[in-house]
């Protein structure tokens, strides 16, 4: 599952950490003051490069609440668990309650550990001290979006998933061992008036039903301005790769009307998690009709897709979400690069920065018409073995990444489209003078509906997919050389996306993306994507952002997995 995200203004991004701690510490009453620059364009470049604002210098003794804020949001000196626990001692009972209110996941864990639905401030503080600072920060990472919990935390407590507060240096592997004979042969009963169905996505009328459900009731941003608009072509590409099973396309219909009112899907994937290869069900496209959101269908759908996977001997699951659940393997942040800034501005997707004008933004994000890399061309089927080889060698650098067969590589990088069908993915290779494939990159298309916009119906969005380059595979790793090559490749990818009338180019902070996001004028978004493994414990994997939720170019990311 992807997450809808929009760019945030630089000044908003700059103070993001402070806003996350707003229930604990009051913001500095004196507003930041920015010096006026000679030209707005210079002001924007300087602001983007430095990402900071000058504050009036004022010496004062730090309050206990300020210390807690620093322990939570980061400061000049990196906080430790001891710093955080010491700061907790200075919180008032009200502040402890406000802190827990920032994250329902943490609140639920505290309630469970204290055996109380309404633990006292002392009980809550004691429970929090048993958690690591990393767990606390993971819980706060979604920036307030956790109010919309996916399902119930009581449900997740019964499932084989890691819990908050566990040691981060545990042996990796399955949490629960089962046998197929132990799996229920029939699904759980639904509430009266609803029935299970298996959707046949090879039938036009049924994939249209799934499309319409997702188009009206799938993921949207917090302000309900944008919602994913997956076309039937994209849905087939995402849900019908080699090895797909009809039984993994699970629906719920209203018994009387036959209306499809809920859906969940899964595809098989061979996932390398550090040194182990795990066969997983990659769960995606969980959608429930808005009128049924209070019927607690989410846990029921998850249990059913789990049951069907278990019947095939698949015991692990892979999923992503924009909310914090117990317990993320990693957390990445969305970044956005405007291609058609004017349209994005008119849709309310891209803000107009302070002290700027639309024409400056259009000029800032302008791209040339022609690509620059010699030997760059679209992928052909004859290239697939070379691309597979480069993909697997490059992805050895990451901790969690899918392994692909030739058939899977063809499907994901070079899918066949019929007459009138929308193209799902664009893949390009670089062929040198010796006819060797030295680089490749790919991106896929998902449109977003601009809800209630009178001027534009959809935003055409490109999502960075997989890439690889020989520059990153030299005997002596040269990060500077890799950074330059990735910037060259992605710049050409942006030009190609412009050629195909995309409006914005999105990327997460996974893989080596932190090396090119800033230079290619990607702006930080307000969306996070958390990666989860079901029935498999894995120690945390870097997500490409630091504790302040800023790009971590030094450590990069261990996530080498992109889910449409």
Curated annotation (Swiss-Prot):
GO CC aspect terms: cytoplasm
Reactions catalysed according to its record: N-terminal glycyl-[protein] + tetradecanoyl-CoA = N-tetradecanoylglycyl-[protein] + CoA + H(+)
Bias type Basic and acidic residues, positions: 45-54
Key words, A-Z: Acyltransferase, Cytoplasm, Transferase
Enzyme's top EC category: transferase
UniProt feature, compositional bias: Basic residues: 55-67
Localization annotation: Cytoplasm
EC number of the protein: 2.3.1.97
Subunit structure: Monomer.
Protein name, entry field: Glycylpeptide N-tetradecanoyltransferase
Organism per entry: Gibberella zeae (strain ATCC MYA-4620 / CBS 123657 / FGSC 9075 / NRRL 31084 / PH-1)
Gene that specifies this protein: NMT1
């Amino acid at each position: 599952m992807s997450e809808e995200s929009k760019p945030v203004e630089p000044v908003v991004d700059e103070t993001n950490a402070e806003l996350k701690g707003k229930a604990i510490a009051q913001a500095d009453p004196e507003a930041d003051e920015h010096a006026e620059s000679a030209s707005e364009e210079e002001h924007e470049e300087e602001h983007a490069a430095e990402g900071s604002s000058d504050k009036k210098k004022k010496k004062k003794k730090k309050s206990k609440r300020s210390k807690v804020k620093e322990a939570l949001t980061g400061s000049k000196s990196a906080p430790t668990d001891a710093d955080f626990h010491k700061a907790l001692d200075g919180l008032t009972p009200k502040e402890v309650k406000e802190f827990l209110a920032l994250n329902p996941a943490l609140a639920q864990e505290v309630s469970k550990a204290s055996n109380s639905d309404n633990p006292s401030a002392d009980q809550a503080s004691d429970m929090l001290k048993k958690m690591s600072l990393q767990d606390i920060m993971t819980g706060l990472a979604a920036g307030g979006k956790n109010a919309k919990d996916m399902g119930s935390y009581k449900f997740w407590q019964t499932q084989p998933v890691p819990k908050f507060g566990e040691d981060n240096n545990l042996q990796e592997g399955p949490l629960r061992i089962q046998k197929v004979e132990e799996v229920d042969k029939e699904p759980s009963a639904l509430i009266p008036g609803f029935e299970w169905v298996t959707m046949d996505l090879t039938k036009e009328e049924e994939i249209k039903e799934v499309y319409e459900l997702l188009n009206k009731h799938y993921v949207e941003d917090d302000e309900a301005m944008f919602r994913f608009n997956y076309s039937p072509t994209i849905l087939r590409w995402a849900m019908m790769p080699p090895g797909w099973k009809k039984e993994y396309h699970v629906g719920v219909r209203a018994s009387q009307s036959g209306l499809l009112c809920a859906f969940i899907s899964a595809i098989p994937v061979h996932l390398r998690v550090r040194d182990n290869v795990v066969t997983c069900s990659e769960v995606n496209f969980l959608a429930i009709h808005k009128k049924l959101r209070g019927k607690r269908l989410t846990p029921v759908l998850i249990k059913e897709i789990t049951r069907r996977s278990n019947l095939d001997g698949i015991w692990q699951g892979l999923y992503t979400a924009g909310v914090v659940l117990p317990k993320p393997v990693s957390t990445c942040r969305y970044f956005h690069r405007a291609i058609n800034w004017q349209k994005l501005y008119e849709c309310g997707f891209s803000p107009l920065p302070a002290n700027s004008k639309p024409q400056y933004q259009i000029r800032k994000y302008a791209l040339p018409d022609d690509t620059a890399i010699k030997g760059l061309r679209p992928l052909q089927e004859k290239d697939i073995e070379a691309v597979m080889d480069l993909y697997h060698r490059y992805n050895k650098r990451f901790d969690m990444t899918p392994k692909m067969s030739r058939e899977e590589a063809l499907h994901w990088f070079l899918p066949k489209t019929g007459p009138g069908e929308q193209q799902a993915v664009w893949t390009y290779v670089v062929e040198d003078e010796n006819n060797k494939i030295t680089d490749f990159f790919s991106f896929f298309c998902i449109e977003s509906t601009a809800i209630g916009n009178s001027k534009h119906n959809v935003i055409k969005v490109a999502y960075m997919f997989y890439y690889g380059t020989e520059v990153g595979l030299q005997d002596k790793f040269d990060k500077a050389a890799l950074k330059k090559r990735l910037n060259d490749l992605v710049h050409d990818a942006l030009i190609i996306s412009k050629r195909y009338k995309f409006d914005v180019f999105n990327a997460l902070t996974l893989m080596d993306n932190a090396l090119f996001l800033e230079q290619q004028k990607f702006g930080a978004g307000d969306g996070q994507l958390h990666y989860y493994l079901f029935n498999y414990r894995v120690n945390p994997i870097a997500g490409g952002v630091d504790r302040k939720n800023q790009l971590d170019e030094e450590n990069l990311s261990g996530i080498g997995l992109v889910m449409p």
